[in-house]
A protein has these predicted regions:
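Short acidic, Pro/Gly- and aromatic-enriched capping/linker segments at domain boundaries
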Residues: 1-11, 80
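Short acidic-glycine-tyrosine-enriched beta hairpin
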Residues: 79-97
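A short hydrophobic beta-strand segment most commonly corresponding to one strand
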Residues: 92, 102-126
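Glycine- and acidic-residue-biased ligand/ion/polar-headgroup-sensing regions
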Residues: 61-79, 89
């Protein structure tokens, strides 16, 4: 079965955001057009971030797919690691604040930033 690699941003038991990769089976369709199962969604939002944009540490408000449409996006974690997503890149962001926790910018969440010579355009689907 052909698969698609899904980058997942999630919250570990210690409350810190981490990256992991999962495989999404593309088990239907034709050899020229392999398809995954249909995933439910309830909305989407487009975002434009100018050159130089960088957020503060924050948690994902709700699990959502992030697709980079134009430019490059870097996502950084508390441990100093980061990933750069180029146009066409994607990530499933699910690093929500643990139940009962109070947000601590030195422990929880991730930051995101525009990288490269072009503004960043992203699509969020939840």
């Amino acid at each position: 079965v052909t698969t698609l690699t899904k980058l997942v941003l999630y919250t570990e038991r210690d409350g810190r955001a981490q990256f992991r990769e999962e495989q999404v089976p593309l088990a239907s369709g034709t050899p020229q057009s392999m398809l995954s199962v249909a995933f439910p969604s309830s909305g989407y939002q487009l975002r434009y971030s100018p050159i130089g944009y960088r957020s503060q540490f924050h948690c994902t408000p709700r699990p959502q797919w992030v697709f980079v449409l134009e430019g490059e996006m870097e996502i950084g974690l508390q441990d100093g690691s980061s990933r750069v997503l180029k146009a066409g890149g994607h990530c499933y962001a699910a690093d929500s604040l643990p139940p009962g926790a109070t947000f601590d910018s030195k422990v929880h969440g991730h930051w995101s930033a525009q990288r490269g010579a072009d503004a960043l355009v992203t699509l969020f689907v939840w």
